[in-house]
Amino acid sequence: MHFHERFDVIVVGGGHAGTEAALAAARMGSKTLLLTHNLDTLGQMSCNPAIGGIGKGHLVKEIDALGGAMAIATDYAGIQFRTLNSSKGPAVRATRAQADRALYRQKIQNILQNQANLRIFQQAVDDLVVDNDRVVGVVTQMGLAFEAPAVVLTAGTFLSGKIHIGLENYSGGRAGDPPSIALAHRLRELPIRVGRLKTGTPPRIDANTIDFTQMTEQKGDTPLPVMSFMGDVSHHPKQISCWITHTNEKTHDIIRGGLDRSPMYSGVIEGIGPRYCPSIEDKIHRFSDKSSHQIFIEPEGLNTNEIYPNGISTSLPFDVQLNLVRSIQGMENAEIVRPGYAIEYDYFDPRDLKNSLETKTINGLFFAGQINGTTGYEEAGAQGLLAGMNAALQVQGKEAWCPRRDEAYIGVLVDDLSTLGTKEPYRMFTSRAEYRLLLREDNADLRLTAKGRELGLVDDARWASFSEKMESIELELQRLRSQWIHPNSPLVPVLNPHLNTPISREASFEELLRRPEMDYSKLMQIEGFGPGLADPLAAEQVQIQVKYSGYIQRQQEEINKAVRNENTGLPLNLDYKEVPGLSNEVIAKLNSHKPETIGQASRISGITPAAISILLVHLKKRGLLRKSA
């Protein structure tokens, strides 16, 4: 049975990757279908009710700069906002928001329902239709076939998902949802390497049974940050506190006593869990010298009594979970409303993907999110946007696009995955980016919005706002460079009290701002130097560009050197055994990874600069040197 309409792009899955993928393809004018097993769970926050953080906030800002929905939904759902690393340099500052689950889901669903070119349909997908190594559609659980030349799979943890609580386990995509068994079996027939990963979630606690007076209150920031470049503080709902408590030796003894019934430590779970978000069992085992671990007590929303205890993800049996929770200060009488659990699921080796997130073996088939071995809403959303965009570009007969490592954290994410692969759930950190001074949260729109407009991702309202911001920044920078103060100026007596060293020679306003003791806000408040920019984001940009100009310029010079051969393309059908001078190890690694560019090849472990030189000579001799997009 065939559906009565044909589509350009089909997106399978309605989580964070799927929603961004569907919205991106539709924004670009492609007739898009989003298939989900349950319309009510579109945009669901399956684990932690929070968006952003170190590295992750950078991804959210980049999604936003390209017209995505995640940051906007966070501004409407965020019940506590904080800027992490606020005392450090701008490269590692990151926005994090605690979100109301219900409000977030409602906003995402509202955005989806109002998106032109997007159809949403409730049906689980069981099969792919492939013809001559090209995807041509999907078949749902009830045998309904949908046709499209491009399909984006965002199956999350649903592929052969298995939920573990103690030594009990059952099939599930997440608590309360069925797994995708038939689709998982179909995907295992494809020539793509497959593995198993696991992730987990903590028990949810009834807030009415917690004694918050025994915990440390953690308030949000003042003034309140916003997540979206189009956001406003007025969009935020009521703001509330989170709380901090700690495990103790009694907690650790309870956990150790239950390890014989832990699926992780009894060999029941084979999948590898996230290194940077370990279960409490893992923490006790790996950090046995620590007598306590911090727990963030995070409300799940304004109209629910559920609390998310961030830091005690566990798959221990329920009785052990209850005892360990009640051993924690402030939770002596706590009641669990949902048990914690681990979930094991299929993922596919991202080295079998192009950097467009299209599979190398099946044309038109794109993967995004946890199916590629990542963990986190933000990582999923970034991949979804990229995959949806490239699916639309392909249907429109245009070249694929992916930002380079020096252009976006999205570029770092995709390059790491497609070049190096991953054996554990991959999480983004600022430390993964070698050019992080240029990849800041504050300039994500400056880096990406113009490209997003060119690709058709950015609407008129965002473009107008961005253009106005760019113009005001440029005009203010010109003003600061062109206005000067002389030692005998009447402004000097007003200015000198604010300086560590009094003015002794002619100086531009820009030079004054570059002084360590001066900032933009302070300078603009001094009579004769203001009023300056009213837009705080534009003002922040002016300050950073002036104060860090030397460092930024040096990093840009490094990038210019590095990209010389970065985009030199490598034929996917090149047999590296035919390249004279390469060692057997290098040949094996290159034939296994099949890198798309010289840049990707150079980042594969064990590939030496000498091997890269040999490759370049070989390509030149055979007239194969080409530059990719």
From Swiss-Prot:
Binding site for FAD: G13, G14, G15, H16, A17, G18, V125, S180, Q370
Coiled coil: none
Keyword match tRNA processing: yes
Subcellular location per the Swiss-Prot or TrEMBL entry: Cytoplasm
Main location: cytoplasm
Domain of life: Bacteria
Function: NAD-binding protein involved in the addition of a carboxymethylaminomethyl (cmnm) group at the wobble position (U34) of certain tRNAs, forming tRNA-cmnm(5)s(2)U34.
HAMAP family tied to this protein: MnmG_GidA (MF_00129)
Listed name of the protein: tRNA uridine 5-carboxymethylaminomethyl modification enzyme MnmG
Species this protein is from: Shewanella sp. (strain ANA-3)
